[in-house]
Amino acid sequence: MGISIKGLNKAYFSEGNKIRALADVDLTIPANQIFTLLGPSGCGKTTLLRCIVGLETPDSGEIAIGGETVWSSERGIFVPPEKRGLNMVFQTYAIWPHMNVFDNVAYPLQARKEPKKDIIQKVKKTLQFVQLEGFENRPATKLSGGQQQRVALARALVAEPKVILFDEPLSNLDAKLREETRKELRDFLTTLKITAVYVTHDRVEALALSDLIAVMKDGRIIEIGVPKKIYFDSDHRFVADFIGRANLIDGTVRAVDDSYAIIDSSIGAIACPESPDTSPGNKVSLCIRPEFIRVMADDTPQKRNIFRGKVESLVFVGEAYEGEILIEDTRLFTKIEPTARVEAGDEITLFFDPDHCFVLSK
């Protein structure tokens, strides 16, 4: 079930100042997809989520879920949260410590006064789905973080909602468990073919979970795209920098040669794929991800995108070294294989993959 948002505005007043949490947001969330709202703290993503579920009242605009308007300032429509057919998984899970797993999951059905036989059947089916069969009588206080997250998911699923909304549900888990749980969560949601709206500030989480990502800043949607498009070929400088470590280099288009634009920059000429923004004379910004800057042998023949630089620092992070390289007066970030014989202070030869040097249009 899809969600349509038109002209949504929400402002707060703090210490006499007006803060626009949402500024004329227009957004269409497709049915049966995992749609992530990604952005830094204070960008408006949680406010937008709370407006969708009905926990916040917008100042103006319209929200429709499955074609039914649930909020409209112009037409005076407000459908209360409990009648919107939504469920929400919070950051804290909100698992009741005095209840066992069965009672936690069954609570939404008990609140609707469904027949006991139906409740038992639905809870059993849902616990099987989230791989918690046999945990029915386990006290909530005896569950691991990952198990609590699955109980919260089961409680959201058992009522068969039209849409599930997630407000940073993995942020309290340790790194390893977070990786395992986000894979499980994607598998669950993909199998169910349910519409999910997911809020996070974690870019890796967004890339791993999502079918579509909307990047927000200052109450506005800056860019929407599939994860690979957002990461490898984003349009906006802010998005390119936020979604992952990026080397941003300004320059001027000198010429276009054999489908590649030649950009004059502070470190020299850089070749990148031709695009509508690479007309000769145009001033452009290039984005080059660290993983597409490779260390080469010192005797590598001169060709496009070969540069010499000095290693300023190296940090070992397990699967690679994260290096800071100085080329002329420009500091760049790169990833270097852990087996490479490179040390801080070395002069090295670098190659920028031309097919992964992309021009930012905004």
Task: Report residues per predicted region.
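Glycine/charge-rich catalytic "coupling/switch" loops of P-loop NTPases
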Residues: F232, Y260, S265-E312, T339-K362
